């Protein structure tokens, strides 16, 4: 009798495990390719200005400081509206809000193709930030609605892998468009116009394709849907035994402050690199715009491989700290080498491309840290808090690089600045004790 009971229990557990495997696989196949597509469109629209700048600043008479400030203007409104938008995703509808985001940013991107003055450029970037705000934290929150903790890092890695994948598409496309001249419009203008249209189209599709939560998923079989809902509810109950911190409590916790500062510095370097790397390669090498865009396939490939391998290995070993810090330190070392070997053109180009590729690998493992330690209700606002302060690095980094370029008439100071922020960010992550709950306190009696 006892053996039969144990055997029946074991069989039931095996069947339940099989249902769980099917549910996890079906969700991944349904959601991740579409999320990947959304982020490719997002990344293309966000960084096409870096390729456009190979011609735009010269055509419009912009200095490096004007370009850097214009790029940074995006992050002012992005930060202002990010937290409210992320909370809307949590409390209202990811499907409707993300569709709205994509359609509006596509329209603003198209209009950017018609700017003529610095003021118009600033305004276009300012409104693009407002349109796009909350897309990233909203997508992170959306993934927490569908993926269990053990799968989340790989899901986020898939999201971030769209960045270098988009560069693989965007670099040669930009190289071709920069050489066209249609309807009295130069190529950099067509770059904005033609890359804004897909956002409007895909945003419309998003409204009909996405499902907000598993309980609403008619495409999941009943047993798989029930398993996934229960699994996520069990995780939620465990997390909700911890009290969510207030904003003031978060700022009093040294670990949270360290995490916020590390992300701010990492994005100061990363966003500075992303928006300036075509200009850096052009000025270091003197090659054509088309060759620049082809060279930029190298960091995209390195970044794609590094991000997926790092995210996979981080999940396999259940280790986050080193998997986040090492890519930052590696990128910093490459930019430090640039300050020493800038006049050796082959060494400089290799260091620049490697450093730009390494920076992608830390993203998914960084975001796996807070997602494992926060309750779902607090996740939207907390992601927004960390990401909002971090995104200010986009303003700080791009304006500082433009200022240093204009002030010194050299790239050396900018390379040193980027190296410094990467190294400090990496060391802050190394100093972080992530085995203890971050930003949460035991529930009081």
Where are the language model's segments positioned?
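Helix-to-loop junctions at the C-terminal end of transmembrane segments
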Residues: 81-94, 306-319, 405-406
